[in-house]
């Protein structure tokens, strides 16, 4: 059975919600989805005073376990147009996996969030791609076959690079139905391709 890791970092819960939608998409294909998060780097008292979402039941991933999966779909909010440091820090510890080629041939994909429509969603997802390529992974996005990313009738995230959500500056906007559909589509798309590559 194809095994897919949905690995995320979420300060306020938006990416967490998207991660579980991605996992639903993975499971819709018959593949196994495992949802885990990366460790928090912010001191607990600072996280609490900043109103971070502290009750996230997903277990914390370890670097070594990445080799156990056929595909890895990562999600993290944008920070000034690039990947949040918590996720970047996690991947910066994968040198041993790179040296041994443990991720070569696996599928890599990414999703994100930002406060505004032009807050760096595409640059954040693109920020993951060099890491995937250095590991020898096959990069997969969100194809235009998902028609939900078309049109200008409503505010919505999502691009050919990957699913995304727009949170508003105060975090009050939750992922919309179309954004969650995009996450599910991406999860299913990745799982199907991973199954073919690992056959």
Swiss-Prot record:
Signal peptide per UniProt: none
UniProt: FMN binding residues: 10-15, 78-80, 113-119, 134
One Pfam match: FMN_red
Gene Ontology molecular function: flavin adenine dinucleotide binding; FMN binding; NAD binding; NADH:ubiquinone reductase (non-electrogenic) activity; NADP binding; NADPH dehydrogenase (quinone) activity
EC numbers, comma separated: 1.6.5.2
All copies of domain Flavodoxin-like, residue ranges: 4-190
Cofactor note: Binds 1 FMN per monomer.
GO cellular component: membrane
Positions bound to NAD(+): 12
Cofactor: FMN
Family, similarity comment: Belongs to the WrbA family.
Stated name of the protein: NAD(P)H dehydrogenase (quinone)
Source organism: Agrobacterium fabrum (strain C58 / ATCC 33970) (Agrobacterium tumefaciens (strain C58))
